[in-house]
Amino acid sequence: MARIASVNIPDSKRLVVSLTYIYGLGPTMAAEICNKAKISKDKKVKELTDQELISLRNIIESEYKVEGDLRREVTLNIKKKKDIRCYQGLRHIRKLPVRGQNTHSNARTRKGKAIAIAGKKKTVK
């Protein structure tokens, strides 16, 4: 397995697909990186030469925020919003959907498991 941006990428897959295993690189960015490195997108990772791997590493490390740096930036942005107590920050604090989604009947993933409410006590007539 080749190692790029401290991630082991699979050898048997095409280069474009393998690059998407790196956090922060989707299919579009992976194709863009292949074009910059002048490497065919359909080439398998195990067919790459050492020089091609080095050029891929250099392009990714110099031009893109990936893996730890990107995760750190995202968490710092969320923390900053929480600190200034803007609307999105408050939604993060309350563990509710941030981007305007409805919460009346949905948002179970974000809110957590449903909490049962005790039923009304039946009175004997």
From Swiss-Prot:
Belongs to the universal ribosomal protein uS13 family. The keyword rRNA-binding applies. NCBIfam families: uS13_bact (TIGR03631). Part of the 30S ribosomal subunit. Forms a loose heterodimer with protein S19. Forms two bridges to the 50S subunit in the 70S ribosome. Pfam families: Ribosomal_S13 (PF00416). Keywords: Ribonucleoprotein, Ribosomal protein, RNA-binding, rRNA-binding, tRNA-binding. This is Small ribosomal subunit protein uS13. One of its GO terms (biological process) is translation. InterPro entries: Rbsml_uS13_C, Ribosomal_uS13, Ribosomal_uS13-like_H2TH, Ribosomal_uS13_bac-type, Ribosomal_uS13_CS. HAMAP family: Ribosomal_uS13. GO terms for molecular function: rRNA binding; structural constituent of ribosome; tRNA binding. Coiled coil: none annotated. The gene is rpsM.
